[in-house]
Amino acid sequence: MLAKRIIPCLDIKDGQTVKGTNFVNLRQAGDPVELGRAYSEQGADELVFLDITASHEGRKTFAELVRRIAANISIPFTVGGGINELSDVDRLLNAGADKISINSSAIRHPQLIDDIAKHFGSQVCVLAVDAKQTENGWKCYLNGGRIETDKELTAWTKEAQERGAGEVLFTSMNHDGVKTGYANEALAELASQLSIPVIASGGAGQMEHFRDAFTLGKADAALAASVFHFGEIKIPELKSYLCDQGITVR
């Protein structure tokens, strides 16, 4: 069994790490360079950096901050936010990113997935999906959860896989920041439909939630933000707990 990954996420707004609940009510959570270094030293398997206002505000992710974080960590680094064309990908990879996460731009221009996979390899392309459970199933949203689309979660992620996405980062907007556990039923459905890794996001509040994402949700990795930023869960203790639960971690 492949080792499960634990991934802290830095949600960046105006150069600072922030964390909200259900995608709103953002509060400060610390200096991203310091947090990135700390997580790398504590044994995080990867780090994700999402410039959460880039797509909404229509500006480019600041490569300089990416460069500073990358210089201070020794783990794989995924960067997302405001990536609309291959030149954006090139700039961020040159700044030290290992993978690129695309969300709104992929829904608007699905060909971008094909282009990134062709030019840089599928392993670079992470499809991020913000989805909300509605009466009509799981619907995908644009621009940091602000605009509902007609894309259905499973159908869209399957299309992205066919186009060359190497991973899916699925955030449940219903669960984001509320710390009651991940969307395990939806995760398990994705895992059964896709052959690429699925990263769980949205809902971590205690160690059991990570266990459940891996056992019930069949996720390959679990991402969290506030529980790590505010010291509620420490990564070495989490890995020790998961190991005791019979889950293979790095």
Swiss-Prot record:
Ligase listed as a keyword: no
Places the protein is found: Cytoplasm
One of the GO BP terms on file: L-histidine biosynthetic process
Report disulfide bridges, numbered on this chain: none
**Briefly, what is this protein's role?**
IGPS catalyzes the conversion of PRFAR and glutamine to IGP, AICAR and glutamate. The HisF subunit catalyzes the cyclization activity that produces IGP and AICAR from PRFAR using the ammonia provided by the HisH subunit.
Describe the subunit structure: Heterodimer of HisH and HisF.
Q: Please give the name of this protein.
A: Imidazole glycerol phosphate synthase subunit HisF
Gene source species? Bacteroides fragilis (strain YCH46)
What is the organism lineage in this UniProt record?
Bacteria, Pseudomonadati, Bacteroidota, Bacteroidia, Bacteroidales
